[in-house]
């Protein structure tokens, strides 16, 4: 069981450590001012060994008609006296300025993160680019974005330092109809001076209302790195399916 926990942490952690899906973390709220949440937790369990878990996940925005400030974080530690299963953290800050009250925004962002189990001592990046909302109806929204960012990464075991400028592109959508919802985000991030070195990822969720009381939810996540670190697969993916039964009126 512990082996499965470690493998799950490594797979999800590697994907998360390379491309953070900001789209599904955004707060889609037209209200001006402050909104969001600050989540923190701690748990401990004694079962032969003492296992404990810590996490801190802020997601806060401040929004006006022209300006949008957004802070996202995810800090987690899971371990025992003998072994560490998760020791990772990420903080992301983003500022967006609407252009002439239109569908375009100019964004600036920066990020810092670490992941002990993935040999990542430090990764930082900073970038800027455009975001375009090109479909906006009651039931359908489509967004596209393109930006350039510089990333710096230090590996902890061998002291390797990686630096690169990447071109980040994404397409996201939110579709809701009666009894159906479909959301997705696709990222493509080639390295500017080596276009054959690229990352591609996607997260897609489909919700289907079978009856008034029964819903089905399907999710697929994938990540592909054409030039991954040593001993890491080029492609990882995960799928999940669930059923929800509504009771009462």
Question: What are these language model-derived features?
Answer:
Residues 235-249:
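Outer-membrane beta-barrel "beta-signal"
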